[in-house]
Amino acid sequence: MMKDNNVFCRLDTCETVGYATTICCNIIETLTTNYMTVIQVYVGDKHWKNIENPAKAIEIIIPTNTKKIIVENISVNCSYSSKLLPSLENETFLKQIGNKTECSLSSFADALDGNYDEIRTHYPEVQFVHVYPFNSVQKSMSTFIRRFDSTVRMYTKGASEIILKKCKTILNRNGWRYCTIFKC
């Protein structure tokens, strides 16, 4: 927890915690499970809600090519130190190691029948053409990869309100369409 800047302000809190292995609190001191999931997405002109259950995520109808793009984007734009490990017998979710947001995205990619480990093997970080790391001002990050057909593709992840303002086209069920700032 210290590594993630989760510091106790009162000594008596530390003494009370004792030998706990994981305790996560938000700003209003509510205990959480230290696990994040994707709960809604907007893909192919459709808003999918309540997909935190992997069985629900499977119900999402997305064209195969679009799924591949989503899974590839998640795979190359998540830190390679973030991983999903098999859950223990008494746990229902995969064990998330590393950044919880990235793990939740990786879990979503997995629910879309994507194999982020395989993609990470095909695109090792050392072979990225360029990476613009996450920036709190721009609220996004981008990774450029050289694809197998020698083309270069840029993948971006970040705050939707920032990214959508920069989009000139959007991929929907019927392919690419042009959009304006307010009509994406």
Predicted feature locations:
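Conserved cytosolic headpiece of P-type ATPases
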Residues: 1-184
